[in-house]
Amino acid sequence: VRRIVLARELSLEQIKEIIKKIKKERLNLEVECFIHGAMCVSVSGRCFTSQFLFNRSANRGDCLQPCRREYIIRDKDEGYELELDNNFVMSAKDLCCLPFLDKLIKIGVNAFKIEGRNRDARYVAVVTKIYRKAIDGEKTDLKELERVYNRGFSSGFYFSVPGSDEFVNLYGSLAKEKKVYVGKVVNYFSKVGVAEIKVDNNFKINERMVIEGETSGCVEFLISRFHDERKTANKGEVVGVKSPKVRKGDKVYVIK
């Protein structure tokens, strides 16, 4: 064993003591902690609700997330129902350690885990970039993380046991921005750095464009100009956009 992955229920002080013990015993062990992303309401994510209700196992990566839905209280004897002040009684906010990442680094955590399953390329690109900057000691801003999918942010168990205010009160994302699909790349001209795009939804100059593909990853840039000096690209047209390297078949979005 070279690395241990610590439970998400551990506090900062408990992690500190574990690392002290490892060093004291001269154990050749690395420590990994979860620092960003969705938090399962069950202890260490060992939830069977999706399996029980829909025969889709969370422990096999197939969770339908029934915890994210609204619930009511119903009297079994006479059927009376009560709506709660916040009906999302099992939907926890996302963990975000950016504000105190330096503390985890200081106590000696070796590796950080960021949620990536079922997330799009832009989410992965934005979140990993911000945390990479933080690890390298560069200035970061929580607002950057608020741009992509999130359910609101919590410090989890790092400083205390989460209370009722650590649960969300709506379904879906609180992201400040959203991607809008606008077309596909049909060609890329490397010599001039222009992507030819088949337009499915209108977009215009000075909007931020995101192009995603299996090989291209996530490419985000400001539309500075179209190849033919137009101002707007309309549905059904094929237009050229000045772009970093992308590939045929990549999906094209603008950020709203």
Which residue stretches match the model-derived regions?
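Surface-exposed amphipathic alpha-helical tracts and adjacent flexible/coil segments at the periphery
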Residues: 1-256
